[in-house]
Amino acid sequence: AGHGSFLHDENAVTYLAEAVAKLGNHTFPLVISDSVAEFLSAVAEETGLDFDPASPDLDGTLRKLGSIARIVGATLRDTANPTMLKAGYKANVIPQTAEAVIDCRVVPGRQAEFEREVDELIGPNVEREWITALDSYETTFDGHLVDAMNAAVLAHDENGRTVPYMLSGGTDAKAFAKLGIRCFGFAPLKLPPELDFAALFHGVDERVPVESLEFGTQVLEHFLLHS
């Protein structure tokens, strides 16, 4: 700590700002998990697009998916998005400490490598700790529940197809997995093609069309009554 009018070789805000910028601008390596591979294969069959992991323009191909490209892209690699900053108590005082919160989403099986990369990026002047630490979770797409999901969708949309995907957001599946319970995300919505649904998440106008909810309710009712 010290007076803001003096020269300072060490500044917690500067150290933190540099670390946060490096993390926020870093692109983690491409990782295709089994679930994502199955999803891309199914989408390729339906759209004719070629999702070749070796392609230098894989991200460009993903953009052709439209509004879901950001969701799918977030499952192909780890992400570390700065969301909160805290430092200082007065404009003319150099603070002793500075803190940042980084929203990290790690592809299953990448935890150790992710932490190593983060440590290299933030450097020796910044310490890190996990606020919440639960391993990423993935299961195989099979079993009677999967069959019941598919049957429920087909009962209300004869052109529907149930495919696995990986959710970059957090769910209770991470906790249930520790108890040996397999979890699947199943929230069927029939959305208008022009709606950028992902852009509404945690936004000022977050919403879902009533018709989409009605469809989802019918599918879930069928699922619960027949599974």
Describe each PLM feature range:
Residues 1-215, 221, 225:
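Metal-dependent amide/peptide-bond hydrolase catalytic core
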